[in-house]
Amino acid sequence: TVAGPPIGGAKSGINFDPADPRKEGVLKRWYAAVAPMLRNYYGTGGDLNVDEIHEVIPMTAELGVLHPQEGVVNGYYKNYSKVEKLRAITRLQSGVLLPIVDERFTPDVSKKYTIADMITGWGVSEGVRHYYELWGGTMNHKTAIIQGWGNVSAAAAFYLAKHGVKIVGIIDRDG
């Protein structure tokens, strides 16, 4: 693993129309199939057209998965006691739902964006910032085009702009 926990890496997806009324059933069957991995060494979350708070967390909880990242905790922190692992998972359970109250980290405090809404976009921005920190240069006065306008891309654009990046365009699946 280049930058993350030494537990391997994978990406999974479902090729399915998110507007199809059978979406909930498809997701529930998929989570049931991967639940053993979600408990031991794999993590999942919200992504394209799948909401972490309203779909992923409740659907995986119905299967006895404590948190969609439970497997990452169990896989990465092998030396943790059961109590320490449970404490880490409990922090995930409460942490992702917390509203961001510091105006430096949210476009609008009154909209009550949560950690789950903003964290991946923040990570994208931090990755870009870290690149310039390692290789020289600055983000200030750079230009960027953002692909999509979901949680990740919108939050990434917000944090990139905070670092002085000028967002000059947004592209979505329709162009």
Predicted feature residues:
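Hydrophobic Val/Ile/Leu positions in short beta-strands of Rossmann-like dinucleotide-binding domains
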Residues: 144-146
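NAD(P)-binding Rossmann-fold cofactor-contacting core
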Residues: 163-175
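Glycine/serine-rich phosphate-binding loop and adjoining beta1-alpha1 elements at the start
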Residues: 1-139
